[in-house]
Amino acid sequence: MATTADFKNGLVLKVDGKLQQIVEFQHVKPGKGPAFVRTKLKDVVSGKTIDKTWNAGVKVETATVDRRDMTYLYNDGTSFVLMDEKTYDQIELAPHLMGDGAKFLLENTSVQVSFHEGEPLFAELPVSVELKIEHTDPGLQGDRSTGGSKPATLETGAEIQVPLFLETGNVVKVDTRTGEYLSRVNN
């Protein structure tokens, strides 16, 4: 059991018999009336998000979540295959458990997978990854001064927008949560 004072992003709660992960929360102390906590909860099974308001100090049942470091091995077309870094056991994860950032994963990338009662709930990908640009249109003289962007295909097959000065073969850092270009990596 936990109280609303223990809320933090990523905490998994049991709400109405379902496992809900806190995505966002905010403690509110109005001038009149009691304090309360606004939360945005994500159902770990279906992925749907809901908004829920709690009175401050309310006790809430938390779920026991076991986090394990795993290595992404490959995608067999229907699921992602990962290996536990301690036991070397392999598991298959459905694409919805990996999230949208999975398109930026290279083989042998470390991923943290959360389990509840032996069942995988979701995977936490690295915040950023470094990937090589497989194809993009060549930059033209003078492109460095303008702030435009162009599409680029990365080595994983994912497509992102990159600055005009980047060329095929450059290595870039990409945010796996948003799919945005962060910076160029010096080789």
UniProtKB/Swiss-Prot annotation:
Supply the Gene3D superfamilies for this chain: 2.30.30.30, Nucleic acid-binding proteins (2.40.50.140)
**What does the record list as GO biological process?**
peptide biosynthetic process
Query: InterPro entries annotated for this entry?
Result: Elong-fact-P_C, NA-bd_OB-fold, Rib_uL2_dom2, Transl_elong_fac_P/YeiP, Transl_elong_KOW-like, Transl_elong_P/YeiP_cen, Transl_elong_P/YeiP_CS, Transl_elongation_fac_P
Offer an example of a GO molecular function term for this protein: translation elongation factor activity
One protein family per Pfam: EFP
**Entry keywords, A to Z:** Cytoplasm, Elongation factor, Protein biosynthesis
> Where does this protein reside within or beyond the cell?
Cytoplasm
Q: Which cysteines bridge via disulfide bonds?
A: none
Is Isomerase set as a keyword in this record?
Answer: no
- Name the pathway: Protein biosynthesis; polypeptide chain elongation
SMART domains assigned to the protein according to its UniProt record, in alphabetical order: EFP (SM01185), Elong-fact-P_C (SM00841)
The UniProt entry's GO CC annotations, sorted and at most eight, read: cytoplasm
The role this protein plays is: Involved in peptide bond synthesis. Stimulates efficient translation and peptide-bond synthesis on native or reconstituted 70S ribosomes in vitro. Probably functions indirectly by altering the affinity of the ribosome for aminoacyl-tRNA, thus increasing their reactivity as acceptors for peptidyl transferase.
The protein in question is named Elongation factor P
This chain's source organism reads Corynebacterium jeikeium (strain K411)
